[in-house]
């Protein structure tokens, strides 16, 4: 089993790029990783460390590829008390639902007993053409919280 499972939800691929970049950085730091783009809940171990990275679609909506995961969290209320997670949202401050998807995912993970490690990073694409840059900066401090 990987030390850290990266879970991405993306409409245009931005969150996938961030997940893949952070997986490389985590491996350079000595962690083993598994990156899953739009996994189903049953694809995941109910323990360990998850890093959830999601863009926001439409009016604060979960990306289509992560909707089944989110809906399963809501409906099944799994016991995720053995999961620690970090969260990164990607969105545009042009919308009043800025990073609404990661807010929803974070809430459902906590409702299922998962413990958040660190603060959620919310990346405004208007300020960062390359969302991998602020995500990598955040990752350094997040790694320290895992120790």
UniProtKB/Swiss-Prot annotation:
Keyword Electron transport carried by entry: yes
Record keywords, A-Z: Electron transport, Flavoprotein, FMN, Transport
Signal sequence region: none
InterPro entries named among the record's database cross-references: Flavodoxin/NO_synth, Flavoprotein-like_sf
SUPFAM superfamilies xrefs: Flavoproteins
Cysteine pairs bridged by disulfides in the record: none
Domain named Flavodoxin-like: residues: 4-143
Cellular component annotations (GO), alphabetically ordered: cytosol
GO MF: flavin adenine dinucleotide binding; FMN binding; oxidoreductase activity
Cofactors required: FMN
Transmembrane residue ranges: none
Manganese as UniProt keyword: no
Family: Belongs to the flavodoxin family. MioC subfamily.
Quaternary context: Homodimer.
NCBIfam families: PRK09004.1 (NF006531)
Function field: Probable electron transporter required for biotin synthase activity.
Descriptive protein name: Protein MioC
Species of the source: Escherichia coli O157:H7
Biological classification of the source: Bacteria, Pseudomonadati, Pseudomonadota, Gammaproteobacteria, Enterobacterales
Gene name in the database record: mioC
